[in-house]
Amino acid sequence: GWMVPLAFIGGYISADFASGLFHFLADNYGSTSKKFFGPVFIRPFREHHVDPLAITRHDFLEVNGVNCAMSVPILLATYALLPVGANLWTLMFAAYIGLFLFGIFLTNQFHSWAHMPNPPRIIRALHRSGLILAPDHHQKHHTPPFNTYYCITSGWLNPILARTRVWERVYE
């Protein structure tokens, strides 16, 4: 029935939240000089605010490599360890994890496309559909005071998190 599609949606929404939480933390905490985390995770987010179009000048591997290196091994291990007999809970778990990790893997790509001046027609259609982060939606993050709309997978959670002032409350 309806529970497996609901798990897919839940996984994708969770990826959107994870992207927002990570983006919020990278923008506001830590140092770019910290070993490993600084240059790999924090610096790209901070530099992105200086040159938002830079992400569009990187190749697929540079944009998505770190997220791929984190999500694909987890996905493979998860599916390798799933029991063979697929009951409803197993299917729901697989659907949730699959869409969560798919969203994490492609978050930076969706973010890049939101900054691309002239994306391909199919990407524009995905933007209009709301399935991936849309440029006009993401622009709110690049508007002073730069303290909202951190979710960059689909952006679905941004209005809710802004209305409830979640990031402001965490920062206080």
Task: Give residue ranges: language-model regions.
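Alpha-helical transition-metal enzyme core signature, strongest for iron centers
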Residues: 14-15, 41, 45-52, 138
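Cytosolic/stromal cytosol-facing helical appendages immediately following the last transmembrane segment
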Residues: 29, 33-37, 50-61, 85-92, ...
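Transmembrane alpha-helices and immediately adjacent membrane-cytoplasm interface residues
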Residues: 14, 77-81, 98
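Catalytic donor/gating beta->alpha subdomain of glycosyltransferases that bind UDP-sugars
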Residues: 26, 35-46
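Helix-coil boundary and interhelical linker segments in multi-pass alpha-helical membrane proteins
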Residues: 1-7, 79-95
